[in-house]
C-alpha cells in the first residue's frame, strides 16, 4: 500500500489547519495519532526538537533544551504537528528537567502504546551546569523490555563537551 486516503487521516486535525491555536499551558490532549502502515516491522521514528522550553518550578526562570524522542511504533504513531504543539504547551509549565522528560514519555506511551520509546533532553546550562535527563521504556514481557534495560545500561557512556547543544 502506498499513500493514505482521507478517511485514514480523519483523526489528524491539526496538520494543514491554518487556524492553529498555540496553547501556553501543559496540554496532553492536543496530541494526535495516525495508523502505522507497517506494524509488522520494527523501525525507529526519531524526532529532534531543538526549541523546547519550560519553566523552573521554583524560580520561574526559563529552561531551554533540545529533546530527542525515538520510538518503535506498534499500531499508532504520533502526528508531528500535534507533537510540536504539545511540546510548545510546556512553555509556561513549571517542572524540573527530569520530570518534563518523564511526563513527555508517559504521555506518549499512553497515546501510542509503542513497543519501545526513549526521551532525552539536553538542556542548556544554567548556573554553570547542564542537565541531560534520559528515560526509556520497553513493553513489559517482550524483547523491548530487555532492549530498554540494555540501552539504559549503555546510555551516554562517553564524556562530551558542552558545545554539542
From Swiss-Prot:
Keyword Cell division attributed: no
Catalysis performed (reactions): 7-aminomethyl-7-carbaguanine + 2 NADP(+) = 7-cyano-7-deazaguanine + 2 NADPH + 3 H(+)
Short name of any one Pfam family annotated for the protein: QueF
SUPFAM superfamilies named among the record's database cross-references: Tetrahydrobiopterin biosynthesis enzymes-like (SSF55620)
Biological pathway: tRNA modification; tRNA-queuosine biosynthesis
Alphabetical list of InterPro entries matching this protein: GTP-CH-I_C/QueF, NADPH_dep_7-cyano-7-deazaG_red, QueF, QueF_type1
Residues at which substrate binds: 78-80, 97-98
Localization in the cell: Cytoplasm
Active site: 56, 63
Lineage top rank: taxon: Bacteria
Family: Belongs to the GTP cyclohydrolase I family. QueF type 1 subfamily.
Listed name of the protein: NADPH-dependent 7-cyano-7-deazaguanine reductase
Species of origin: Bacillus cereus (strain ATCC 14579 / DSM 31 / CCUG 7414 / JCM 2152 / NBRC 15305 / NCIMB 9373 / NCTC 2599 / NRRL B-3711)
Amino acid at each position: 500500500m502506498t499513500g493514505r486516503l482521507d478517511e485514514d487521516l480523519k483523526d489528524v486535525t491539526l496538520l494543514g489547519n491554518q487556524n492553529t491555536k498555540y496553547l501556553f499551558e501543559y496540554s496532553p490532549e492536543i496530541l494526535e495519532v495516525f495508523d502505522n502502515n507497517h506494524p509488522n516491522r520494527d523501525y525507529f521514528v526519531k524526532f529532534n526538537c531543538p526549541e523546547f522550553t519550560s519553566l523552573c518550578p521554583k524560580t520561574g526562570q526559563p529552561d531551554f533544551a533540545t529533546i530527542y524522542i525515538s520510538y518503535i511504533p506498534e499500531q499508532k504513531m504520533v502526528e508531528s504537528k500535534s507533537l510540536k504543539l504539545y511540546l510548545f504547551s510546556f512553555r509556561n509549565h513549571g517542572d524540573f528537567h527530569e520530570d518534563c522528560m518523564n511526563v513527555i514519555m508517559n504521555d506518549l506511551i499512553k497515546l501510542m502504546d509503542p513497543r519501545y520509546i526513549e526521551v532525552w533532553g539536553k538542556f542548556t546550562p544554567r548556573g554553570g551546569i547542564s542537565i541531560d535527563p534520559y528515560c526509556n521504556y520497553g513493553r513489559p514481557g517482550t524483547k523491548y523490555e530487555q532492549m530498554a534495560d540494555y540501552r539504559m545500561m549503555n546510555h551516554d557512556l562517553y564524556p562530551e563537551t558542552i558545545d554539542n547543544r
